[in-house]
Amino acid sequence: AYRKVHHPPIAEMKDFGIFLAGELERFIDETHLDRSRMLGVGIALPAVIAPDNSRITLAPTLHLRDITLQFLAKEIPYPTYIENDATSGGYAEWFLYWHRDMAYLLLETGVGGAVLVGDGQYHGVNRRSGEFGHMCVEPGGLPCKCGKRGCLEAYCSAWRISDDLGIPLSEFFAGVERHVPEYETMWHDLLRHLAIGVNNIRMVLD
């Protein structure tokens, strides 16, 4: 079952947690899921999460920094685990392909990733491994929401298209198919930097 809802701005984590718990219960009721069979709830966020799972260290696309997570799952009456969105997507692919070692690259509003080897994710010292979106693919290049310049995310994310052109993705790709010069130029620039990023990942991980 699947449901998409619009959420209020994440200004207060406590209020957002109450909203999230309410939407979850509504979803369970509408889809007639058996609560007694629920193993738990997963919350995926486009954010760097502290090693102890206590706070968001940085979430550029959400405009959040150093925000506590203690209230996010407080109203949810099921075991709840909070994880980075790209890591969650990486695990889904990892299970699908029978636990093969892999690097997962996610292109959405931002750019993320995960490295999964052996029995699970390689976290790194600060639980930041797989942040492929913030590897440099153009020294001194476009500014990124993380504060650096030349990041893969600055070139290959949906927000670049929406910020630079002021249009949604659907309109952008329709324009590429119609050979609109401005859109084609950005598309080829995006592909060039994506190729650099993918090649970097390949060379590092073999």
Give the role of each language-model region:
Residues 4-25, 29-42, 47-103:
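Glycine-rich phosphate-binding loop and adjoining helix at the ATP-binding site
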